[in-house]
Amino acid sequence: MSLNIRVIAPDGLIWDTTAEGVVLPSLTGQLGILTGHAPLITSLEIGILRIKTNSKWTPIIVLGGFAVIKDDEVLVLISGVEEVIKEDYSKAKSILAKAKIDLDSAKTTKEIIDASQELKIASAKVKAFKFI
């Protein structure tokens, strides 16, 4: 048996496939979904959504959203998506270093929130390279 997975962003369909499993970046931690999972609705934070097809994990950086799981169907509605390109690992590491500096130097509440979001995205990108 397999899961039917659809990932949709505001600008359109990102992913539509059958898969062996999926790991969602929920607000309470990583949430693994396999066939036969109980019905569930969960919020997603910025992080790595992983889809397992043909015994291989594919990472997708999601920028928050939510997921609905029912009857081996996984519908993921996300606020946005970031691409993970294999050749960009060193660039991702330098962006992560800059994001840490920006957060340390942030003074206003808005600067802190913006820098925190950028740090989460940069950190997810660097971690995603483990799966490609």
UniProtKB/Swiss-Prot annotation:
Keywords: ATP synthesis, CF(1), Chloroplast, Hydrogen ion transport, Ion transport, Membrane, Plastid, Thylakoid, Transport. GO terms for molecular function: ATP binding; proton-transporting ATP synthase activity, rotational mechanism. One of its GO terms (cellular component) is proton-transporting ATP synthase complex. It is found in: Plastid, Chloroplast thylakoid membrane. Its main location: plastid. It is a peripheral membrane protein. HAMAP family: ATP_synth_epsil_bac. F-type ATPases have 2 components, CF(1) - the catalytic core - and CF(0) - the membrane proton channel. CF(1) has five subunits: alpha(3), beta(3), gamma(1), delta(1), epsilon(1). CF(0) has three main subunits: a, b and c. Produces ATP from ADP in the presence of a proton gradient across the membrane. Belongs to the ATPase epsilon chain family. This is ATP synthase epsilon chain, chloroplastic. It comes from Pylaiella littoralis.
